[in-house]
Amino acid sequence: MAVTINTELDPVFLKALGYLHSKSKDSAEKLKALLDESLCKGNDSVYRPQPKEVEQPKAMLSKVKPETKASSSTPSSSILSKPLASEKVKKEAEKRTADKMKVEINDIMDIPKKPRIEKTEARSSPVTVQLSKDLPVPDLSSFEETSADDFAMEMGLACVVCRQMTVFSGNQLVECQECHNLYHQDCHRPQVTDKDVNDPRLVWYCARCTRQMKRMAQKNQKPSQKPAPSAVSAVTPVAKDPSVNKPELKSKSDSANTFLAFKRAEVKASSAVSSNPSNSGVSSSSASGLTGWAAFGAKTASAVPVSGKLGTNSQATSGKPPSLSSVQKAGTVPGLTPSKAGSVSKSGSGGSSSTIPLKPLPPLILGKTGLSRSMSSDNVSKTGLPSPNPSSSGSVSSLSSQLGSNNGSSNTAGSNVNSSNKVAVDPSMQQSGAKGPTSQESQLNAMKRLQMVKKKAAQKKLKK
C-alpha cells in the first residue's frame, strides 16, 4: 500500500497539467493564476517552478517524483478508501501524463527559444541598420570618389596637377612623350599653347622632362669633349676635299702607269738603237716598235699624205738624206723629234763636235717639230710623262757620236750610207706615217674612257 500512496499526485499539480495540455487560449493565464495561488498558500516547499525546468527535462522529471512523494505523505482519507482499480487507472494516467510531460517539455523548450531568437534578431537588426546607415554610407561615397580618382590616376587619364579629367576647348589634356603624364594646358607651367596641342608633328615634353634631358645632354657632352679631337681627326680626312680627290689621283697614276707601259717599250727600243752602230738597226728597231703601237688602233689613210708632206718638205729644204731618219723617228716618238733630228743631222755631216752641225739647219728643225707636235703634243701633255725625253736624246746623241766616229773619214761616205738607208726606210716611213697618229688617237680615247669610268666609280663610293 505504501507504493500506491507514493504514486498518488497532488490535485493542484494535476490541474496545472490540465491547463498545460489544454489548447484553449486562456490556459496560459489560468496556469499562471494557479501558480500564484499555490505560492500564496505557502506551498513553496512543495512546488517551486524554476527556469531550468524548461531547459532540462530530466530535472523536471526528477522534481516531479519528490513532489508526488511530498503530496502523498500528507494524510488523506480519500486515498485510503479508493479501491485498487482506481489506483490502476491512476497509474495508467500517470504513465500517459509522464509521456505527455516529455512531449510538452520538448514543446516548451521550443516555444521559449523562438521568442528569444526573435528578440535577439529584433535587438541586433537595428544595430546593423544603424551601422549601414551611419558608418558605411559616407565612407562609401568618399571611397567611390577617391577610388575613381585613384583609378583615373593609375590609368593615366587625369591631370597630374589638378587630378581631374575635365576637358574643354583651350584646356585640353596633353601627354608628355617622355614620362607619359597628362597635363591640362592651364595647369602646366609654362602654359601649353593651342598650337602645340593641335600640331600632330610636335613631340611635346613637360618642363620636368625637358630639364632632365638637358642635364643628361650636358653630362654626356662633358666626357665626350676629351676624346673629341681624336674622333674629329679620324673623321676629318673623310670629310675633306683631298679624300674626294684621292681616287682621281689614283686613277691618274694608274693611267700614267698604263702609258708608262707603252713608253717603256719605246725606251727599250731607243736603248736598242743606241747599242746598234748602224742606221739599218735603227730602222729595224723603229719598225718593230711601230708594229706594237699599230696593234691598238685602226688604220686611217688620212695620215699618209701628212707623212709624205713631211718627207717632201725635208728633202726640199735640206736636200740631205738624214731628214728621212729624223722624220721616221718623229713618226715613232713624236715628243722626241727635236733632239733626234739634230743628232742624226750630226751623223750625216760627219762632224766630231755636237754644236756646229745644228747651226746650218734651224728652219728645218723648227718646221719638223711644229708639224710633229701638232699631231702628238696633246698626247704628251695629257700623259704628263716628260721623263723619256732626256734619256732618249742622250741615247740618240751617243748613237750619233758612234756614227760620227765610224764615218768621220769623209762626208760622201755618210751621205751614201744615208742614201742607202733612205731606200730601206721609205716603206717603213709610209707605214709609220699611216699608223702612228691612229694608234695615239686610240690610246687617247681609251685613256679618256678609263678616266671617266674611274671618276664614276669614285663618285659612287663617295655617295655610299
Curated annotation (Swiss-Prot):
<dbReference type="InterPro" id="IPR051776">
    <property type="entry name" value="Integrator_subunit_12"/>
</dbReference>
<dbReference type="InterPro" id="IPR013083">
    <property type="entry name" value="Znf_RING/FYVE/PHD"/>
</dbReference>
<feature type="compositionally biased region" description="Low complexity">
    <location>
        <begin position="384"/>
        <end position="421"/>
    </location>
</feature>
<feature type="compositionally biased region" description="Polar residues">
    <location>
        <begin position="372"/>
        <end position="382"/>
    </location>
</feature>
<dbReference type="GO" id="GO:0160240">
    <property type="term" value="P:RNA polymerase II transcription initiation surveillance"/>
</dbReference>
<dbReference type="InterPro" id="IPR039054">
    <property type="entry name" value="Int12_PHD"/>
</dbReference>
<feature type="compositionally biased region" description="Low complexity">
    <location>
        <begin position="227"/>
        <end position="239"/>
    </location>
</feature>
<comment type="function">
    <text>Component of the integrator complex, a multiprotein complex that terminates RNA polymerase II (Pol II) transcription in the promoter-proximal region of genes.</text>
</comment>
<feature type="compositionally biased region" description="Basic and acidic residues">
    <location>
        <begin position="85"/>
        <end position="98"/>
    </location>
</feature>
<keyword id="KW-0863">Zinc-finger</keyword>
<dbReference type="Pfam" id="PF00628">
    <property type="entry name" value="PHD"/>
</dbReference>
<feature type="compositionally biased region" description="Low complexity">
    <location>
        <begin position="339"/>
        <end position="371"/>
    </location>
</feature>
<protein>
    <recommendedName>
        <fullName>Integrator complex subunit 12</fullName>
    </recommendedName>
</protein>
<feature type="region of interest" description="Disordered">
    <location>
        <begin position="216"/>
        <end position="252"/>
    </location>
</feature>
<comment type="subunit">
    <text>Component of the Integrator complex, composed of core subunits INTS1, INTS2, INTS3, INTS4, INTS5, INTS6, INTS7, INTS8, INTS9/RC74, INTS10, INTS11/CPSF3L, INTS12, INTS13, INTS14 and INTS15. The core complex associates with protein phosphatase 2A subunits PPP2CA and PPP2R1A, to form the Integrator-PP2A (INTAC) complex.</text>
</comment>
<keyword id="KW-0539">Nucleus</keyword>
<dbReference type="GO" id="GO:0008270">
    <property type="term" value="F:zinc ion binding"/>
</dbReference>
<keyword id="KW-0862">Zinc</keyword>
<dbReference type="InterPro" id="IPR011011">
    <property type="entry name" value="Znf_FYVE_PHD"/>
</dbReference>
<dbReference type="InterPro" id="IPR019786">
    <property type="entry name" value="Zinc_finger_PHD-type_CS"/>
</dbReference>
<feature type="region of interest" description="Disordered">
    <location>
        <begin position="42"/>
        <end position="98"/>
    </location>
</feature>
<feature type="zinc finger region" description="PHD-type">
    <location>
        <begin position="156"/>
        <end position="212"/>
    </location>
</feature>
<feature type="compositionally biased region" description="Low complexity">
    <location>
        <begin position="69"/>
        <end position="84"/>
    </location>
</feature>
<feature type="compositionally biased region" description="Polar residues">
    <location>
        <begin position="428"/>
        <end position="445"/>
    </location>
</feature>
<dbReference type="InterPro" id="IPR019787">
    <property type="entry name" value="Znf_PHD-finger"/>
</dbReference>
<keyword id="KW-0479">Metal-binding</keyword>
<dbReference type="GO" id="GO:0160232">
    <property type="term" value="C:INTAC complex"/>
</dbReference>
<feature type="compositionally biased region" description="Polar residues">
    <location>
        <begin position="312"/>
        <end position="329"/>
    </location>
</feature>
<dbReference type="InterPro" id="IPR001965">
    <property type="entry name" value="Znf_PHD"/>
</dbReference>
<dbReference type="GO" id="GO:0032039">
    <property type="term" value="C:integrator complex"/>
</dbReference>
<dbReference type="GO" id="GO:0034472">
    <property type="term" value="P:snRNA 3'-end processing"/>
</dbReference>
<feature type="region of interest" description="Disordered">
    <location>
        <begin position="312"/>
        <end position="445"/>
    </location>
</feature>
<comment type="similarity">
    <text>Belongs to the Integrator subunit 12 family.</text>
</comment>
